[in-house]
Regions:
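Carboxylate-rich, polar loop motifs that coordinate divalent cations or form catalytic acidic clusters
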Residues: 1-175
Length: 175
């Protein structure tokens, strides 16, 4: 009898604590985004920014997903504030929440207020084409063919840093 009471007490306590402290697994919801949903092409890179937007770089443009809607950005030859090319290599968000997009024809910075892009140019007005990007405390380094460029947070300037004359067509891809 004592054993039966002990078992009954244990079962009762377990039942009470189960109701008080229920075991809950986290519920994760996801939505698969595909070409049917308007995704421009095969995904090359993905970035989640500080505001929670998911940026998707493809071979046929850039897309921004807010959890409900997919917005596409493509190069428009007649619009100087569009992305410089549709082939997106890499994206990165810096400590000042600038989003940098490296494309086949230049580097662009996303302008949140106007929902468009500014394209980085060198001193002769040509687009800067970078193969790699690296965040630093004072700014952003961009590695290009035979060159390294630096964007400074302090004075918001973009300047040429260092040539590489070691080999022809040397790319600074590992900054």
């Amino acid at each position: 009898m004592k054993k039966e009471i002990s078992i009954l007490l244990c079962v009762t306590l377990l039942t009470l604590f189960t109701d008080i402290f229920p075991l809950q697994a986290g519920h994760y919801y996801y939505k698969q985004i595909s070409l049917k949903d308007g995704l421009p092409s095969t995904v090359r890179c993905i970035l989640t920014d500080e505001q929670g937007f998911v940026w998707i770089g493809t071979r046929a443009g850039l897309a921004r997903y807010d959890g409900h809607e997919l917005k596409k950005y493509i190069h428009q030859a007649d619009n100087p504030h569009s992305i410089p090319h549709n082939f997106i290599y890499q994206m990165i968000e810096d400590e000042q929440n600038n989003i940098w997009i490296l494309t086949d024809k230049g580097v662009a910075r996303y302008q949140r207020q106007s929902d468009n892009f500014s394209i980085l140019t060198n001193e002769t007005g040509n687009n800067i084409i970078a193969n790699s990007v690296c965040l630093t405390k004072g700014g952003v380094l961009f590695g290009a063919r035979n060159k390294v460029f630096f964007y400074s947070y302090q004075d918001t300037s973009f300047r040429f840093l260092q040539p590489f004359d070691l080999r022809p067509n040397y790319n600074a891809t590992l900054l």
